[in-house]
A protein has these predicted regions:
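A short, internal acetyl-CoA/4′-phosphopantetheine-binding micro-motif in the GNAT/acyltransferase core
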Residues: 43-49, 185-192
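Conserved acetyl-CoA-binding loop-helix of GNAT-fold acetyltransferases
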Residues: 54-59, 193-206
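Conserved GNAT acetyl-CoA-binding A-motif
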Residues: 66-74, 209-220
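Single conserved hydrophobic/aromatic residue that forms the stacking wall/gate
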Residues: 225-234
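Short amphipathic alpha-helix that is part of the acyltransferase structural core
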Residues: 1-10, 38, 43-44, 97, ...
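Conserved beta-strand in the GNAT
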Residues: 26-31, 99, 160, 166-174, ...
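N-terminal charged segments
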Residues: 1-65, 78-79, 83, 139-140, ...
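A short helix-loop-beta-strand connector motif used in the catalytic cores of GNAT acetyltransferases and
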Residues: 15-18, 67-68, 82, 96, ...
Length: 234
């Protein structure tokens, strides 16, 4: 189980680059002007030698310069005492990330309920649709996010559902090793509960199987550790 957790942690780090990153004593500090928690947090990737108190203080100082809260991503492979250290400094649990996996060798390919347009390359149309569905109006985010998607170092599957000329649903599949990760699932509010999300996921999985994927994973973010600062869930 631990080996699979480690694999998915590695895959998810590959899948979603940040605007900028910094390596600090076995930690990765990720910066994206707080577009999402995942792209604007501290992740542990290796052993440390600097005292923990000093490392946390350093991270807080760096993120304060960016004008964003200090967020630490916690995974099941980490020492549970780290949670306590953070709580002693005033941190609290803000979101939980549920990770679901699927054995694609046992998955029965089915035709999606709704037609889905797939592309291997990102397009301005897909990005504008994503921004519209997420309500992204921050000019810095609209400037840096396209480069973050284009920096994904793996093969990609961009999915869109249209109503006329308008994108009403998006999704993204990222192929890495024998896995496909499903990301960026968004559906316009007035079109929800009409199987659009299911159609997007099935289309991505079907395409990934054609590319040789044997495992799928989906991360639904609802929890990270954050300092007591103003914040906005993306």
């Amino acid at each position: 189980m631990n080996s699979k957790i480690k694999i998915i942690e590695d895959l998810s780090l590959n899948a979603w680059p940040s605007h900028q990153m910094q390596i600090y004593d076995g930690w990765i500090l990720r910066f994206s002007y707080f577009y999402t928690h995942r792209t604007n947090c501290v992740e542990q990737i290796g052993p440390s030698s600097i005292p923990l108190r000093d490392k946390i203080a350093y991270c807080e100082e760096v993120y304060a310069k960016w004008g964003t809260p200090t967020i630490f991503k916690i995974n099941p492979l980490m020492d549970s005492s780290f949670d306590q250290k953070l709580m002693e400094r005033g941190y609290h649990t803000a979101h939980i990330t549920e990770v679901m996996t699927l054995d694609l060798e046992k998955y029965k390919i089915q035709k999606p309920p709704r037609p889905v347009f797939l592309s291997r390359e990102i397009s301005p149309d897909w990005l504008n649709g994503l921004f519209s569905l997420k309500g992204t109006v921050n000019e810095i985010h609209r400037k840096i996010v396209p480069s973050m998607y284009r920096a994904i170092p793996k093969d990609t599957i961009f999915a869109s559902i249209y109503d006329g000329g308008r994108i009403i649903g998006t999704g993204l599949g990222i192929l890495d090793r024998d896995y496909v990760g499903i990301y960026a699932i968004h559906v316009a509010e007035e079109y929800r509960r009409q199987h659009l999300g299911e159609s997007i996921c099935r289309s991505i999985l079907n395409s990934a199987i054609d590319e040789g994927a044997t495992e799928g994973y989906l991360q639904v973010v609802c929890l990270l550790y954050t300092s007591p600062s103003p914040r906005d869930c993306s």
